């Protein structure tokens, strides 16, 4: 397949994003292929983002702001060529609306896995929830997108085996984490900005 970037008139920023999103997982996986072969594990690249900018109301389940809708469309452009076959969201409309442009573009139905809190500590995520999302994202190898929340994305990176566990504040919406899982519980993490 020949790609003519000049005829498509991609601007320099879009071209750089395309190169990073498409080539970074290959670079990260290159050093991990041997470990994956030894463990009979399919290398998986998982893209994690926090939902896009949300409205203030209704507080329980707000929709996206116009800026959030634009960010969701930009995410679809950025990850449109990343060969994503699995998309996972929470039950909240802000995550579904963030994933929707990419899901529509790829013809992929997003899987909704409701966020569950620990029965032991209401401030912690349920270990079963984290395991279910990580297992679903890595089930078939390939590439996956998880759209989460400021409190779920760091914990999901950890559940996937990542050693970089960022803190995401409530005003930050432009983080894109690329987690290359090369063995059960072992991964490399790259932190990009959308």
Descriptions of predicted regions:
Residues 2-7:
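Secretory targeting signals
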Residues 10-21:
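N-terminal export leaders
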Residues 19-29:
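Bacterial N-terminal signal peptides
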Residues 32-36:
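Sec/Tat signal peptide C-region and signal peptidase I cleavage site
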Residues 40-141, 153-155, 159-194:
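Active-site-proximal alpha-helix that buttresses catalytic centers in soluble enzyme cores
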Residues 143-147:
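Periplasmic-binding protein-like
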């Amino acid at each position: 397949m020949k790609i003519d970037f000049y005829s498509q008139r991609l601007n320099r920023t879009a071209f750089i994003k395309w190169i990073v999103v498409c080539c970074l997982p290959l670079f990260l996986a290159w050093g991990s292929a041997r470990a994956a072969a030894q463990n009979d594990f399919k290398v998986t690249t998982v893209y994690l983002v926090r939902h896009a900018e949300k409205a203030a109301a209704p507080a329980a389940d707000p929709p996206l702001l116009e800026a959030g809708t634009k960010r969701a469309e930009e995410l679809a452009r950025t990850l449109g060529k990343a060969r994503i076959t699995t998309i996972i969201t929470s039950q909240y409309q802000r995550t579904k609306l963030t994933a929707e442009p990419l899901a529509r573009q790829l013809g992929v139905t997003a899987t909704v896995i409701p966020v569950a809190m620990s029965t032991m500590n209401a401030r912690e995520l349920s270990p079963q929830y984290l395991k279910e999302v990580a297992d679903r994202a890595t089930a078939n190898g390939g590439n996956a997108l998880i759209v989460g929340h400021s409190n779920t994305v760091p914990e999901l990176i950890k559940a996937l085996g990542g050693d970089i566990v960022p803190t995401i504040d409530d005003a930050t919406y432009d983080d894109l984490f690329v987690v290359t899982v090369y063995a059960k519980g072992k991964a490399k993490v790259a932190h990009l900005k959308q």
